[in-house]
Structures are given as C-alpha cells and as structure tokens.
Regions:
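Membrane-helix interface segments in multi-pass membrane proteins
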Residues: 26-76, 131-152
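Juxtamembrane cytosolic face of transmembrane helices
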Residues: 2-12, 83-96, 110-113, 120-182
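Cytosolic-side membrane-entry/anchor segment at the start of a transmembrane helix
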Residues: 1-40
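Hydrophobic, aromatic-rich alpha-helical transmembrane segments
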Residues: 3, 7-11, 15, 61, ...
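FKBP-type peptidyl-prolyl cis-trans isomerase
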Residues: 101-103, 176
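Short, acidic, Ser/Thr-enriched surface-loop or helix-capping motifs
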Residues: 105-107
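Alpha-helical transmembrane segments of polytopic integral membrane proteins
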Residues: 21, 25-28, 78, 91, ...
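Alpha-helical transmembrane spans of integral membrane proteins, capturing the lipid-embedded, hydrophobic core
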Residues: 14, 18-22, 26, 72-80, ...
C-alpha cells in the first residue's frame, strides 16, 4: 500500500490549481467582457439612432448587461469545470501533477474512470448544480448544490485525519498518493 498524502500537500496542490484557475478565468473574462461591451455599445448606438427620445433610457441595455454578466459567469464556471476535468483524464489536477501526486484507488492502484468521474462530480457538486440550475432555469439545483457543496467543503478537512482521505475520497474509495516515478 502506498503512502497517502496528507492535508498539507493536498492544500498546496489546490493552491496551485486556484492560481491557474484565476489566471484562466481572468483571461476568459477579459476577452468575454471586451466582446460583450463592444456588442452592447453597438446596440446603444443603434437605439440612439433609431429613437433619440429613448437615448437616455437604457432599460433594455441594462437587461442585456445582466444577461452578459450571467454569460460570463457561466463561461468561467465551465472553464473551471473543464480545468478540473484533468482529474478524470489524467488522474490528477495540474497542481497535483506539478507536485508529483495522483489519485489512486483505496489500495494504491490506478483509480478507475468511474471512480474518478464520481469523485469529480462530488468534489465540484456546487458548480455542476449551478450549470444545471441555469440550464433548467430553477433555483432548486442551486440550493442543493450549495448545501452539498458546503458538506463536501467541510469534508475536505477529513484529509487532515489519520486516514488522509477527504469525504469525496471516502465516498468514491480513492486516495491521493505520491506517484512512483516522482
């Protein structure tokens, strides 16, 4: 059985991931907001040209701005989900890879794709539910996503215990270990 990685290294890997996610989100947000601002300005110009009396009233434009912000938020959420999907395909996030860690099954062998998908969905339940809430236009997913997300967040601190397993690892029978060749 391989040595399980404790809370400290896992937290360091997560910190690395967060830096990458912030950079990725910032780049995406910057391009998206620039594009949407150009679009919004074109709509305002068109509105002012078609009806000068409505030039000072941008109610429709404000609604468009809210829709644009929602789109940007969803784009960022999708980017984060995509970034962390490396855990499914590579058995580790970028932060874990940089620190020479991997996700394994409970006895230290390679984790199955099913276990990695389950772990991913549990770990990112809040973001997955936010996307579902947007797609079906109901707040129920958002509420339960927040609730389960909070439980999983608290469960991350289980990795500081003797078994070095977070709640999502316990539920999916996975552990985080040092790679053999690292």
């Amino acid at each position: 059985m391989e040595k399980r990685i404790g809370f400290g290294l896992r937290l360091a890997a997560f910190a690395i991931d967060i830096v990458f996610v912030w950079i990725l989100s910032g780049i995406i947000s910057r391009f998206a907001t620039t594009f949407m601002a150009v679009q919004a300005q074109a709509q305002v110009d068109e509105l002012m040209a078609s009806n000068p009396l409505l030039a000072g009233m941008y109610t429709g434009e404000m609604l468009n701005m809210v829709v644009s912000v929602t789109r940007i938020s969803l784009i960022v959420i999708f980017a984060r989900l995509l970034y962390f999907s490396t855990e499914i395909f590579l058995g580790a996030s970028v932060g874990k890879l940089l620190l020479g860690l991997k996700i394994a099954n409970a006895d230290g062998g390679n984790a199955s794709v099913g276990a990695l998908i389950g772990r991913y969905l549990l770990k990112h339940v809040k973001r997955v539910c936010t996307v579902l809430a947007f797609l079906v236009l109901t707040g129920v997913f958002n509420f339960f996503g927040s609730l389960f997300g909070f439980v999983i967040f608290i469960g991350c601190f289980f990795a500081a215990g003797d078994r070095h397993q977070a709640l999502h690892d316990m539920m999916c029978h996975t552990i985080v270990v040092k790679k053999e060749n690292a």
